[in-house]
Amino acid sequence: MKKPEREHLRKVAELGCIACAKLGYHDTPAEIHHITSGAMGKKSDNYSVIPLCPYHHRTSNESYHLSPLWFTEKFGTQTELLKETLEWLK
């Protein structure tokens, strides 16, 4: 991974969880979620990422990885969340 990619991932993680922010909880520590694309669910590149806390990313029944349909209905599509994330970085 090149330095610009690492820097981008760091900045995204520093934003805090985008799902928590939509619920009114700001500055929740986040990890990186690579948005998936295509029928095979391939991970995207290191610039197509959104910040999610472990709860919303992978550990709860409300997480993207365990309940993607529920998560999408509640918070929006991965593409919509990516667009918001990129706006936050401006």
Language model feature labels by segment:
Residues 27-35, 61-66:
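Short Cys/His-rich "knuckle" micro-motifs
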Residues 28, 48-49:
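Conserved catalytic motifs of the protein kinase core domain
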Residues 39-48, 58-90:
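Polybasic, low-complexity binding patches
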Residues 12, 34, 53:
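Divalent metal-coordination and catalytic microenvironments
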Residues 21, 54-57:
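Cys/His-coordinated zinc-binding microdomains
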Residues 2-31:
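Short cysteine-rich loop/turn motifs with clustered Cys
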Residues 22, 35, 40-42:
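The feature represents the first ordered module of a protein
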